[in-house]
Amino acid sequence: MEIKVPQLSLVLLVGVSGSGKSTFAKKHFKKHEVVSSDICRGIVSNDENDQSATNDAFDVLKYIISKRLKNGLLTVVDATNVKAESRKALIRLAREFHTLPVAIVLDLPQRVCEDRNEERADRNFGRHVIRNQKLQLKRSIKGLKREGFRKMYILKSEEEVNNLTEIVREKLYNDKRELHGPFDIIGDIHGCYDETILLLKKLGYVISTVDNDGKNYGLAVHHPENRQVIFVGDLVDRGPNSPAVLKLAMSMVKSGSALCVPGNHDLKLQKKLNGKKVQLNHGLAETMEQLARGSAEFITDVKEFLYGLISHYILDDGKLAVAHAGIKEEMQGRGSG
């Protein structure tokens, strides 16, 4: 069994005292990735069990988390986190730094947690504490997705915890640091298909007509020197042939000869195709008329293509960021929490 978390994420360990959160964190994460509420309590009071120091401890905990997320570092919160109210402040931090929140819940049987606490001389504070925490967890656990967690994992037994072999760190969709180009970055085509074909040929791309397999739209585009196009949005509107531009971009993205990020015109078209109320101005009316001449199947393909576009890409070992109309540095390479 494995758990997958985004490479840049805020991971909340959730569980009552004695559920094994600290042991879990030590086993699966690096030492400095884990921010412990107990350690923070000790820092501000010299006693990890001093409950009167909890408010100060969580001020320190949130400060450390904010600095780590600001610096683009995966961070794990080792605290009970059994109350939705407690998790809310941490989710707010994740959103502030455009980081995806993940919950790993250790929902072990109450008796197991009680027995473990009785074996710890510094934590034997009575079974009623575990019972209350367990009730709080039970009340709130079903609402984790609604709270804003992007991924949730619930481990309900010691066996499940012990059978966890690996926590896999997944790259964000916008992370293409391994691609080094050369790149040809093309923006604001606005339905001008013929001009785009001329430009691609001038840049050395070979454009061939092939059998239409339903995804290549009868086009095959490649560069003999393995250059790659990055379309920087605004594929549609204003020009005479937005559907052909879409087919070109969709075919090239499918084959790997191009990447594409959306522009505001593309996002507006997506809203319209999904039935949202938008103003048919700035060329959108013409695009809708052009699309209406084609098949319903193609319109479905366009909807799926636009839905799958990523806001920006980070390329070339982090030296290049590509987005329509720019992106603030602190948002580069981030996800939306």
Task: Locate the predicted segments by residue.
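Active-site glycine-centered loops adjacent to acidic/histidine catalytic or metal-binding residues
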Residues: 38, 188, 234, 263-264
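ATP-dependent NMP and nucleoside kinases share a basic, alpha-helical "lid"
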Residues: 43, 47, 69, 82-122
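N-terminal active-site segment of His-dependent metallophosphoesterases
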Residues: 162-246
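Acidic, metal-coordinating catalytic cores used for nucleic-acid/nucleotide bond scission
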Residues: 78-87, 235, 239
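Conserved GTP-binding G-domain of TRAFAC-class P-loop NTPases and closely related GTPase folds
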Residues: 2-14, 19, 31, 96, ...
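Conserved substrate/cofactor phosphate-moiety recognition/catalytic segment
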Residues: 19-75, 85, 111-114
